[in-house]
């Protein structure tokens, strides 16, 4: 019984809705005319009593009562209460329509999945669809008054063809105090499984699709049952109803026209018909009637759902789809656009105005001038001139204590080709902690204050870049890693260290006359750092003044002589200067001991020639048959870059560094 007027409002015209105001079926006039007549009669009766039956004193008292009712009737929040209530009811009404059970998807699946053109196959398909329609009928019969009037008993259901006599006996035999709308679902599932076992449903995927769609259909039916069971709370409906009718009961007295000779505010005119009061009643009471009509769409109102039509339509269409249309196909022919790649159906003369070109986007017609295209230096110009910051950002920048550089720096972009920091960390000289302290892949940069404390003023900075290193040749691990028993005079480290080649760093100093001792200073402590406890070989002991060697005992107890303060400032400033070898093309000479069997490294810091601009950084290698391990005996400050490179000499770029826990005893 739904009132359809979509065709009348298809186009927005001048007074387009005026034709709808004259309809009676489903209109507000049909719903409200009784209440409206009652309100008008009561208002007229009270007005006649005031004007004709009351005495002077009684009129004065009524007038005070009327002013009081008119003043405080507006305190009732009718608009607020009605607005929320009607919104809730309309949403609930539309959700119930969306969840009406439609068997179209199931009939498509049954027609294509249950095979067999014989009588048994036809019986299977029709029975499955009859169970589907029986389920919706049982739900509609329990929630809709119109459907219940059509099928008041189960005999009427059997008579209508939705259920056979045997099925009715089985249905009635099931003793359940609950609504048994779910019984046809069980029958559907059992019959579909039987059809799968018989081969009528050839694939388990098709059976699963049928069950999934049937579960969705069951969800629709159960949702309708839930809407019928749990409605809008009664207290809300009562509040809305009382608010509306109490307001208009107060209006019956408060909106009366009083004697204008008494000079009451707002009562200058004496009219007999309260036009705006009647309109207010029409709107508010009509608003409430909308909620009353939509709160249960399965009734018999003009705008309720056509459930009986749904039952008839679903049964007729579903049986037609699974029976007569099963494997019924029209003959295939070539369409009229067979040789035309751009199919374009014709337009009639009445629809010629709707033939429009395709929409390609809103920016198709937008053009840009040549000045809008950026050149190659657009990024540099953008950074040079700066952003256009908002006012808030400018205020923050003004209040900030951070000083921005006067000229912007050009940003440099670089692609990282390999994880070179795994072997050469990018940090500057850092205090050597222990060999297990492996630098991270992205070590933090050293602070400027630390750099200033490590390097004397005016001394050149060492550059450990990849371009300044000589070629590093890979050697086998067995040729360099051997066992070594530390000397008894040297305190062994409690931490087991990885076996790496021996590295000895000594200082090449200028011939300074001394009284039989070596000048040891904290600033030059790095010059006398020895990484092994092995006694130096003869070739090592025969080095000239450019390669003097200190034993561990000499490091711990420097001999007597001039104090460390007597060392010249020039010697301290040239600690890390490098001596240039005329026969070498590199600024520094690096000779790694992996391919010699052992290593003996000396670091030269003082150049005898004061005019040399780059004193030597000497790393010499000597052969020693006893050397095969490493042990830290001095806590001097050593470059972590150099230390980490020497520890992982045999490690390739894709290897995983492991700590060798095996130790071999060697003769002391």
From Swiss-Prot:
Cite the ranges annotated as topological domain Cytoplasmic: 1-31, 83-237, 289-668
- Transmembrane spans: 32-51, 61-82, 238-255, 275-288
Q: Name one GO biological process term.
A: negative regulation of monoatomic ion transport
Give the start-end ranges of region Disordered.
400-454, 473-493, 532-570
Residues annotated as binding Ca(2+) are 10, 293, 296, 301, 304
Catalytic activity line of the entry = chloride(in) = chloride(out)
Bias (Polar residues): 532-545
Q: Name one GO molecular function term.
A: metal ion binding
Keyword field: Calcium, Cell membrane, Chloride, Chloride channel, Ion channel, Ion transport, Membrane, Metal-binding, Transmembrane, Transmembrane helix, Transport
Q: Pfam families under this entry?
A: Bestrophin (PF01062)
Compartments, as annotated in UniProt: Cell membrane
Recorded topology in the membrane: Multi-pass membrane protein
Q: Which ranges of this chain reside in the Extracellular compartment per its record? A: 52-60, 256-274
Keyword match Cell membrane = yes
Name the family the entry cites.
Belongs to the anion channel-forming bestrophin (TC 1.A.46) family. Calcium-sensitive chloride channel subfamily.
- What's the stated role of this polypeptide? Ligand-gated anion channel that allows the movement of chloride monoatomic anions across cell membranes when activated by calcium (Ca2+).
Q: What is this protein called?
A: Bestrophin-3
Q: Which organism is it from?
A: Homo sapiens (Human)
Q: What is the lineage of its organism?
A: Eukaryota, Metazoa, Chordata, Craniata, Vertebrata
């Amino acid at each position: 019984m739904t009132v359809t007027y979509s065709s009348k409002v298809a186009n927005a015209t001048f007074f387009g809705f005026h034709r709808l105001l004259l309809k009676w079926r489903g209109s507000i006039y049909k719903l409200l005319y009784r209440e409206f007549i009652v309100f008008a009669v009561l208002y007229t009766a009270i007005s006649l009593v005031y004007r004709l039956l009351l005495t002077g004193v009684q009129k004065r008292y009524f007038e005070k009562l009327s002013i009081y009712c008119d003043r405080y009737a507006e305190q009732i929040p009718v608009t607020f209460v009605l607005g929320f209530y009607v919104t809730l009811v309309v949403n609930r009404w539309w959700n119930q329509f969306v969840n009406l059970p439609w068997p179209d998807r199931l009939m498509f699946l049954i027609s294509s999945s249950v095979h067999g053109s014989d009588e048994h196959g036809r019986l299977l398909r029709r029975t499955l669809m009859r169970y589907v329609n029986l389920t919706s009928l049982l739900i509609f019969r329990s929630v809709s008054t119109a459907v219940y009037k059509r099928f008041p008993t189960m005999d009427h259901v059997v008579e209508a063809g939705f259920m056979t006599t045997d099925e009715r006996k089985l249905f009635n035999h099931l003793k359940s105090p609950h609504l048994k709308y779910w019984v046809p679902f069980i029958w559907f599932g059992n019959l579909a499984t039987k059809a799968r076992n018989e081969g009528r449903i050839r694939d388990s995927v098709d059976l699963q699709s049928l069950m999934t769609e049937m579960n969705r259909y069951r969800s629709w039916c159960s949702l309708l049952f839930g809407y019928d069971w749990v409605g809008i709370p009664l207290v809300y409906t009562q509040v809305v109803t009382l608010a509306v009718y109490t307001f208009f009961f107060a209006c019956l007295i408060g909106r009366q026209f009083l004697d204008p000779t008494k000079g009451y505010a707002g009562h200058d005119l004496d009219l007999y018909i309260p036009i705006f009061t009647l309109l207010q009643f029409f709107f508010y009471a009509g608003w409430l009637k909308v909620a009353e009509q939509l709160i249960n769409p399965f009734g018999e109102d003009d705008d309720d759902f056509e459930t009986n039509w749904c039952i008839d339509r679903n049964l007729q269409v579903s049986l037609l789809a699974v029976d007569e249309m099963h494997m019924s196909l029209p003959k295939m022919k070539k369409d009229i656009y067979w040789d035309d790649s751009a199919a374009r159906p014709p337009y009639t003369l009445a629809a010629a105005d709707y033939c429009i070109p395709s929409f390609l986007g809103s920016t198709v017609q937008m053009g840009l001038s040549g000045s809008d295209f950026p050149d190659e230096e657009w990024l540099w110009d953008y950074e040079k001139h700066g952003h256009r910051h908002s006012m808030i950002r400018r205020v923050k920048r003004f209040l900030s204590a951070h000083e921005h550089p006067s000229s912007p720096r050009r940003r440099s972009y670089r692609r990282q080709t390999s994880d070179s920091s795994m072997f050469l960390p990018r940090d500057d000289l850092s205090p050597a902690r222990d060999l297990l302290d492996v630098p991270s892949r992205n070590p933090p940069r050293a602070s400027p204050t630390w750099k200033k404390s490590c390097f004397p003023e005016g001394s050149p900075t060492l550059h450990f870049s990849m371009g300044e290193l000589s070629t590093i040749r890979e050697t086998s691990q067995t040729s360099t890693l051997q066992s070594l028993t530390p000397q008894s005079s040297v305190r062994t480290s409690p931490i087991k260290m990885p076996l790496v080649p021996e590295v000895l760093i000594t200082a090449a100093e200028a011939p300074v006359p001394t009284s039989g001792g070596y000048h040891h200073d904290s600033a030059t402590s790095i010059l006398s750092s020895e990484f092994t406890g092995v006694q130096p070989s003869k070739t090592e002991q025969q080095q000239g003044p450019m390669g003097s060697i200190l034993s561990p005992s000499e490091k711990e107890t420097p001999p007597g002589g001039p104090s460390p303060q007597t060392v010249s400032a020039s010697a301290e400033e040239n600690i890390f200067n490098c001596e240039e070898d005329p026969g070498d093309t590199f600024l520094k000479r690096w000779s790694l001991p992996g391919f010699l069997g052992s290593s003996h490294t000396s670091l030269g810091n003082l150049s005898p020639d004061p005019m040399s601009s780059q004193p030597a950084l000497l790393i010499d290698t000597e052969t020693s048959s006893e050397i095969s391990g490493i042990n830290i005996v001095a806590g001097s400050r050593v470059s972590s870059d150099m230390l980490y490179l020497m520890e992982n000499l045999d490690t390739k770029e894709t290897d995983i560094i492991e700590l060798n826990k095996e130790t071999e005893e060697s003769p002391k």
